[in-house]
Amino acid sequence: MTLLSRRQFNFLTLAGGIAAGLGVTTAFAAEETSVVLLLSGGIADGGWGQHAYEGLKSLEGKPGFKIAYAENISQAQIPQVARGYADDGYKLVIGHGYEFGSPFLEVAPDYPETNFFVSSFLPQPEVPKNILYADLAYFDVAYAAGALAALISEKKASVGFIGGGDNPTQQNMMKAFVAGAEKTVGGVKGVGIVTGDYNNAAKGKQAAATMIGNGADVIWHAADVTGLGAIQAAVEGNVKVLGCYSDQTELAPKNIGTSFEMNLAGMVVTTAEAVAGGTFKGGIEWKPTLAEMWLLRAGASGDHNPETVSAEAWASFQTIWKDITARKIDVAAVLK
């Protein structure tokens, strides 16, 4: 019997969830399915952009797919770039991140035969039927990260969040992190800085260093390249750190507790397969659970590093993780 790795299992779970929501079938249309991935950052950021790109690249090995990507797209450029690929006949245009939500609302109605997917929240109750949005449990994972940060803090004084672009998603992730920390361990203060930039490691390092200087002894980021600077500051400041979007253990093997890895590759593949199968369904928001969308990874140690996370802290965290997944902890309520 072939055993599945946790990554494989999570991919299959995600695929099943999307299949149920989009009506994915395994019989694809004979014609070519062209897919383009649009990113505000780069494909080599070690996480958010890279994992989505890896999913896109994996389509090259599947019959009937044509792929393209464009990176480092500014907010002002989004409509023009999206229209360009739609004009070229691409069947699926993926906007990877919050920045694409509103611009796609303007573009999609002009291209009813093109499918659009945004890996971010539904921006308004009614949207065109050819756009699919997604609530990828960002706030749930931020609350969980805050809880774990508080549990593994040695000083039990302060833990910090480093954010990227200044948008509602990042602001609410910061709020959820703070709530998770402060509700989990009494006396711990959650602090956060949204740097306004996803692609500036120097900003991330400076922000994290400031927090560490003010007493924070655990840092978590959700800031792509900017977050790499935060990890560096944690190493130099000899404090604990939590990774995001990918397994970042190798960047700080002695400091990292775990990484919250996002199954972005599976998201891209299964959405593309829905389009290929003719069963893509837009006009809605897909909502996977925390455990469906996120993995806990710590390199060779498994799901956590026992050198930085005690058995007691991990057991408490696991209960919180399961309760969020089961909706017993209502993270959305703490953001109101």
Question: Model-found features: residue ranges?
Answer:
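A residue-level marker of the well-folded mature domains of exported/periplasmic proteins
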Residues: 30-336
